[in-house]
UniProtKB/Swiss-Prot annotation:
GO terms for cellular component: cytosol. The gene is ahcY. Its cofactor is NAD(+). It comes from Chlorobium phaeobacteroides (strain DSM 266 / SMG 266 / 2430). It is found in: Cytoplasm. This is Adenosylhomocysteinase. InterPro entries: Adenosylhomocyst_ase-like_sf, Adenosylhomocysteinase-like, Ado_hCys_hydrolase_NAD-bd, NAD(P)-bd_dom_sf, S-Ado-L-homoCys_hydrolase_CS. Its EC number is 3.13.2.1. SMART domains: AdoHcyase, AdoHcyase_NAD. Pathway: Amino-acid biosynthesis; L-homocysteine biosynthesis; L-homocysteine from S-adenosyl-L-homocysteine: step 1/1. It comes from the Bacteria. Signal peptide: none annotated. One of its GO terms (molecular function) is adenosylhomocysteinase activity. It is an enzyme of class 3 (hydrolase). It catalyses: S-adenosyl-L-homocysteine + H2O = L-homocysteine + adenosine.
C-alpha cells in the first residue's frame, strides 16, 4: 500500500487498479481540450520547472489530467484529495504508478485525511511547497494554523470544537513537536495558492481582511469559465447522478428543496426540475430569491418547506442550514444531501449524537436514521459532497474549464511576483479558456470589423466585456 523513501512516495487503496485508471484518463483527455491545448502550447518549455506544487483537490480521473498537465509543464507535484469520499481509487493508482506522489483513497477517516494533507506539504529534503492548488482551503488552513501555533503554542491546549478539528490539531501537534519552526519555514518559500471553490475563497478573503494571509492567492472560483460552468452546468448533471446512484429514487413528482440559489443552487434546481420535480428554493439574498421566483420556483423558508420536501439539497457554503430539529420534522423516507463543500451545512454530528435516532448503514455513503416516532430519513455521503461521494463528480469537459484556469493561475503565481492579496485571473485569460473549448462543440465565433470594435470600444481580439459584467 505504501512505498517508503525519505518521504512517502504514495499511499493509495489498490495499485492493481492503475491500468483501469489509465484507460479512463486517456478517455478524459479527449474531453478536456483546454488542458491538452495548454500542454501543447508549452511543449518543451517547462514553465513550471523547479516549482514544488501541493495539490489538495478531489483525486478523480479529471484531476489526474490536471496533475499530469502540471507535471508536463515541469512541476514537482504531490497530491491528496480534499474530501474523505471523493477519491476514485483507480485514478489515484494510475497517478501513483506514473511516479507522482499521491495520498488518497475513498473512505478515509478524518485522521487519515489530515495525515494525507500533511504529506503533500512535505517534499524531499524537508522542504515545503512553493505553490498550492487548493479546493476548500484545507492545505492553506493547515499552514496558517500551524504558523499561529508556532507563535502561540497554547493553541494546542484548547478543546477542539469538533472531531475534524481534533484530527487536524493532532497532526499539527506532531509537526510542532518535530520542528517548532516548520510552518514559518514553509510560508517563507510560498509563492501562492490558487483556490478552486466558493468555500475556500471565503476563507481567503476572511484571512486577508484580518491581515492574516501569509502569501498571495488567486481566486479561481470566480473566473467566469469556472463559476458559470463548473458550478452551474457541472452540478446540473452530477447532482442527479449522485442521488440516483445512491437511492435509485424517481425524482419526477417529488418535492425537492434546494437550499441556496447561487450558481450551484441554480444548477441543482434546474437539474431537479428537468427530472419532473417540483422545486422549492430557500434563500437569504433578495436578489437570488427574486431570480428564483422569476424562473418559476417557489421560494420559501426551510421552516415552511421542511414538511413538504421529499429530497433536500444544500448548496449554500454556510453551516447549519439543515438542523437536527429540521430532520425531526421531515416526511418519512426523506432524502438529504449536500453539494456544497463541507459537511457542516447539515448538522451531521448532532444527528449522530442524538439518542432519539437509530442509524443503519444501507450501503457505502447511504445511511438511514429512524427517529423515536418511527419516521426515517436517508443521509447521503455523510453530508459531504453527494456528487463525488455517491457518484464520480462533474463530467470531464466542464472540469477542463476549471482546471485550465487552475493551470493558468499556477503559471501566473510561479512566473510573476504578487504582493499578498487575493486576485482574480484577468478577463483576457478567462476568454481564452472559453475559446479553447469552442472547437470541440462545433462553435464558430463571429469576428468584429474594425469599425464595429471601435463603435463599442473593445479591442478586436478582446476582452469583449468590462470586469464588472456579470454574464
Amino acid at each position: 500500500m505504501t512505498i517508503e523513501a525519505e518521504v512517502l512516495a504514495y499511499k493509495v487503496a489498490d495499485m492493481s487498479l492503475a491500468e483501469w485508471g489509465r484507460k479512463e484518463i486517456d478517455i478524459a483527455e479527449k474531453e478536456m481540450p483546454g488542458l491538452m491545448a495548454t500542454r501543447k502550447k508549452y511543449a518543451g518549455q517547462k514553465p513550471l520547472k523547479g516549482a514544488r506544487i501541493a495539490g489538495s483537490l478531489h483525486m478523480t480521473i479529471q484531476t489526474a489530467v490536471l496533475i499530469e498537465t502540471l507535471v508536463e509543464l515541469g512541476a514537482d507535484v504531490r497530491w491528496a484529495s480534499c474530501n474523505i469520499f471523493s477519491t476514485q481509487d483507480h485514478a489515484a493508482a494510475a497517478i501513483a504508478k506514473a511516479g507522482i506522489p499521491v495520498f488518497a483513497w475513498k473512505g478515509e477517516t478524518l485522521d487519515e485525511y489530515w495525515w494525507c494533507t500533511r504529506q503533500i506539504l512535505e517534499f524531499e529534503g524537508g522542504k515545503g511547497p512553493h505553490l498550492i492548488v487548493d479546493d476548500g482551503g484545507d492545505a492553506t488552513l493547515m499552514i496558517h494554523l500551524g504558523y499561529k501555533i508556532e507563535i502561540d503554542p497554547s493553541l494546542l491546549d484548547k478543546t477542539p470544537g469538533n472531531i475534524e478539528e481534533k484530527a487536524l490539531f493532532q497532526q499539527l501537534r506532531e509537526v510542532y513537536e518535530e520542528d517548532s519552526q516548520r510552518w514559518h519555514n514553509v510560508a517563507a518559500e510560498m509563492k501562492g495558492v490558487s483556490e478552486e471553490t466558493t468555500t475556500g475563497v471565503h476563507r481567503l478573503y476572511q484571512m486577508m481582511e484580518k491581515e492574516e494571509l501569509l502569501f498571495p492567492a488567486i481566486n479561481v472560483n470566480d473566473s467566469v469559465t469556472k463559476s458559470k460552468f463548473d458550478n452551474l452546468y457541472g452540478c446540473r448533471e452530477s447532482l442527479a447522478d449522485g442521488i440516483k446512484r445512491a437511492t435509485d429514487v424517481m425524482v419526477a413528482g417529488k418535492v425537492v428543496v434546494v437550499l441556496g440559489y447561487g450558481d450551484v443552487g441554480k444548477g441543482s434546481a434546474r437539474s431537479m426540475r428537468a427530472y419532473g420535480a417540483r422545486v422549492i428554493v430557500t434563500e437569504i439574498d433578495p436578489i437570488c430569491a427574486l431570480q428564483a421566483a422569476m424562473e418559476g420556483y417557489e421560494v420559501n423558508t426551510m421552516d415552511e418547506a421542511v414538511t413538504e420536501g421529499n429530497i433536500f439539497v444544500t448548496t449554500t457554503g454556510n453551516k447549519d442550514v439543515i438542523t437536527l430539529e429540521h430532520m425531526k420534522k421531515m416526511k418519512g423516507e426523506a432524502i438529504i444531501c449536500n453539494i456544497g463543500h463541507f459537511d457542516n451545512e447539515i448538522q451531521v454530528e448532532p444527528l449522530n449524537n442524538y439518542a432519539g435516532a437509530t442509524k443503519l448503514n444501507i450501503k457505502p455513503q447511504v445511511d438511514k436514521y429512524t427517529f423515536e416516532d418511527g419516521h426515517a430519513i436517508y443521509l447521503l455521503a455523510e453530508g459531504r459532497l453527494v456528487n463525488l461521494g455517491c457518484a464520480t463528480g462533474h463530467p470531464s469537459f466542464v472540469m477542463s474549464n476549471s482546471f485550465t484556469n487552475q493551470t493558468l493561475a499556477q503559471l501566473e503565481l510561479w512566473t510573476r511576483d504578487y504582493a499578498i492579496d487575493v486576485y482574480r485571473l484577468p478577463k483576457q485569460l478567462d476568454e481564452e479558456v472559453a475559446r479553447l473549448h469552442l472547437e470541440q462543440l462545433g462553435v464558430k465565433l463571429t469576428t468584429l470589423t474594425n469599425e464595429q470594435a471601435e463603435y463599442i470600444g473593445v479591442p478586436l481580439e478582446g476582452p469583449y466585456k468590462p470586469e464588472h459584467y456579470r454574464y
